[in-house]
């Protein structure tokens, strides 16, 4: 890049994607590149490109990059000695100052207990735990050392991957378990008893909490695959909830327009008003910690109270299907079919924002779509009871694979 006339600013240490995003904005740069597999296993290592606003690049930009990269790969690339004389950048303090504007640390530090943190061998280590410790909080941390294979699994803060954190939470009697993925843009949360709290539920809780505490009557943005608990919270507070296609890049414009107090996706992405047009797992974990300190209640107790206040329960399910090539190729055409009924449920609304989403007359729903990043089909469902959501997911699986 330098040989092509670009001025390069280099972060010499592993840097979380949201920190890079903030550095782009803070230093008025034209963009940034992070080499990461994100939440995926090491074999998926690639690059993330962020634009001048710090947000994920839009599809037309990433597609152009892919075409140019493929052409370079076909022609062959010659390398020569690279002088290690780039301008160094330490983005830590400016980013921490930004977090101090977003988080009420005076509230968080009143928490009566410790927090457990799992870095999953990702670059969130030394960031989330550091800022908590800097404010006098007791933090018990695990998997903070560099491991390029992530223990042979992947740095996804999913329920299955957080078993070591669960043991730590129970052993240390922590108020909650906090986790970030490989590049620290996604979050994972465990309650004080070690129970995994779905990212969907965290989004609903934080949305409600921000409206109660920040003095801003703004709406929320959620992807088409994300819980309708967000809509229920919006209705409770009389604010609008915007639906977008899957992909955090679609949330940024609403944030910049000042229309939303929170933007989120069921895949554990979150940002808030005044912050970055990029998901930030560090921020999300800090908001959850602040919320626990402020309400002095477990997350499940808070969720039950929220269900009571909105008048319904919301239980989402997500399923990934690895399909034969032939089935995968046919899926987009099949998703164009029209339904008046699906698996015994009467269809009240069909949404084709991203894939096929069928909303039923009882408020439950199913979304089926091909993944944009992996060779799989994704199924998302939601119902007022966990068993009903599971059944819907199985019905969708049967339809796709028939």
For the regions a protein language model found, what residue spans apply to each?
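Phosphate-binding and adjacent anionic-ligand microenvironments
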Residues: 170, 175-176, 212, 216-402
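Short beta-strand-to-turn element immediately C-terminal to the catalytic PLP-Schiff-base lysine
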Residues: 49-52, 188-192, 272-273
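N-terminal small/polar loop signature for handling phosphorylated ligands or for N-terminal nucleophile
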Residues: 1-45, 131-190
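Gly/Ser/Thr-rich loops at beta-strand to alpha-helix junctions
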Residues: 15, 40-41, 120-125, 184-185, ...
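Buried hydrophobic positions in well-ordered alpha/beta secondary-structure cores of metabolic enzymes
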Residues: 20, 33, 39, 65, ...
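Gly/Ser/Thr-rich active-site loops/lids in small-molecule metabolic enzymes
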Residues: 56-58, 141-143, 195-214, 281-287
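Gly/Ser/Thr-enriched, mixed-charge loops and adjacent short helices
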Residues: 45-169
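Proline/glycine-rich low-complexity loops and linkers
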Residues: 2, 12-14, 67-96, 191-264, ...
């Amino acid at each position: 890049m330098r040989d092509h006339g670009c001025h390069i600013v280099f972060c010499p240490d592993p840097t979380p994607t949201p920190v890079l995003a903030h550095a782009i904005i803070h230093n008025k740069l034209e963009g940034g590149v992070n080499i990461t597999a994100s939440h995926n296993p090491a074999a998926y290592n690639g690059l993330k490109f962020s634009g001048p606003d710090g947000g994920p690049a839009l599809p037309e930009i990433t597609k152009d990059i892919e075409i140019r990269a493929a052409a370079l790969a076909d022609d062959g690339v010659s390398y020569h000695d690279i002088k290690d004389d780039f301008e160094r950048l330490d983005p830590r303090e400016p980013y921490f100052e930004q977090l101090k504007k977003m988080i009420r640390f005076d509230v968080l530090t009143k928490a009566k207990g410790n927090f457990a943190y799992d870095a999953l061998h990702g670059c969130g280590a030394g960031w989330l735990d550091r800022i908590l410790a800097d404010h006098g909080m007791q933090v018990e941390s695990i998997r903070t050392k560099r491991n390029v294979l992530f223990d042979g699994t992947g740095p996804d803060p999913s329920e299955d991957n957080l078993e070591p954190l669960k043991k730590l939470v129970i052993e240390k009697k922590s108020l909650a378990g906090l986790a970030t993925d490989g590049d620290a843009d996604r979050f994972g949360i465990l309650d004080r008893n070690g129970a995994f709290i779905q990212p969907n539920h965290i989004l609903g809780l934080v949305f409600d909490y921000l409206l109660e505490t920040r003095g801003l009557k703004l709406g929320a943005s959620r992807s088409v695959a994300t819980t309708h608990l967000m809509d229920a919270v919006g209705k409770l507070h009389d604010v609008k909830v915007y639906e977008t296609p899957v992909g955090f890049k679609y949330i940024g414009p609403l944030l910049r327009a000042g229309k939303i107090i929170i933007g989120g996706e069921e895949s554990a992405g979150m940002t808030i008003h005044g912050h970055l047009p990029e998901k930030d797992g560090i921020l999300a974990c800090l908001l959850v910690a602040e919320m626990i300190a402020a309400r002095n209640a477990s997350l499940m107790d808070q969720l039950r109270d929220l269900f009571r206040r909105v008048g319904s329960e919301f239980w989402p399910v997500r399923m990934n299907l690895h399909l034969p090539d032939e089935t995968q190729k046919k899926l987009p055409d099949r998703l164009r079919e029209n339904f008046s009924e699906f698996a015994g449920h009467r269809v009240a609304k069909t949404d084709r924002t991203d894939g096929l989403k069928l909303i039923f007359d009882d408020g439950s729903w199913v979304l089926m779509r091909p993944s944009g990043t992996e060779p799989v089909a994704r199924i998302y469902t939601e119902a007022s009871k966990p068993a009903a959501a599971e059944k819907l997911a199985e019905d969708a699986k049967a339809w796709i694979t028939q």
